[in-house]
Amino acid sequence: MSIKIKNFKKNIIINNNNFINENNCNNNNKNNIVQLCIMGDGGVGKTAVTTQFISNHFVYYYDPTIEDSYRKQICVSDKSYILDILDTAGQDELTAMRDQWIRSCEGFVLVYSITCKSSFNQVLNFREQIIRVLDRDDVPIMMIGNKSDLVNERQVTYHEGKELAQRLGMSFMEVSAKNRSNIDEVFHEAVCCVKRKEELYRIKSKHVKILKKNKNPLKKKINEICKVM
């Protein structure tokens, strides 16, 4: 049986009233675009989570995605950001496209369904692919367990999700796209993850420059001594 996959490019900019406060939010942030990639197995609700965040709307039907792009403005820690969200395919036959998606983004949200153990197990594979493509293991990644409203169909416990996330250094939440539980919080935390990593990288780079600067005079002095000898 073949699956007809539609690809609609959605470039939407929406103000999120839950996070934006015109009096407190700084709209002059120069680095205000945060590129997020939503990844996970097919059918876990990646599009449902994204659509609920973007337009407060729950998608009841399953229409497999190739690549959908969304934009939304939010305020995090009194700073305004535009989220550039890439909703990606989970189908195995489209795995070749993932490398390109990964390279285009700076933060990642890995989605599994609490009602499907195999989708939870696949999180490791998605994370490994991200690390392989970007060639670094400090990528801002968070993991979310969707469909938390389906308590009677649960196959993955909250503890299992939290333990895996902690072991791999990822932020973690359980969410429900259907009743909008923790949806805004996911994207708020995703921005924080990206910005924390950026700040750590900035501090690390600054320390490296200081160390190099301090080493140069010593190296010069040693060379002078060697010449004299």
UniProtKB/Swiss-Prot annotation:
Record's subcellular location: Cell membrane
InterPro entries: P-loop_NTPase, Small_GTP-bd, Small_GTPase, Small_GTPase_Ras-type
GO biological process: macropinocytosis; signal transduction
Superkingdom assignment: Eukaryota
Record lipid sites (S-geranylgeranyl cysteine): 226
Family matches, as Pfam families: Ras (PF00071)
PROSITE patterns: RAS
Propeptide feature: residues: 227-229
EC number: 3.6.5.2
GO cellular component: plasma membrane
Short motif (Effector region): ranges: 62-70
Reactions listed under catalytic activity: GTP + H2O = GDP + phosphate + H(+)
Presence of the UniProt keyword Transmembrane in the record: no
GO MF assignments: G protein activity; GDP binding; GTP binding; GTPase activity
Keywords: Cell membrane, GTP-binding, Hydrolase, Lipoprotein, Membrane, Methylation, Nucleotide-binding, Prenylation
Top EC class, one word: hydrolase
Coiled-coil annotated spans: none
Cysteine methyl ester modified-residue sites: 226
NCBIfam families from the UniProt entry: small_GTP
Family to which this protein belongs: Belongs to the small GTPase superfamily. Ras family.
Physiological role: Ras proteins bind GDP/GTP and possess intrinsic GTPase activity.
Protein name according to UniProt: Ras-like protein rasV
Organism: Dictyostelium discoideum
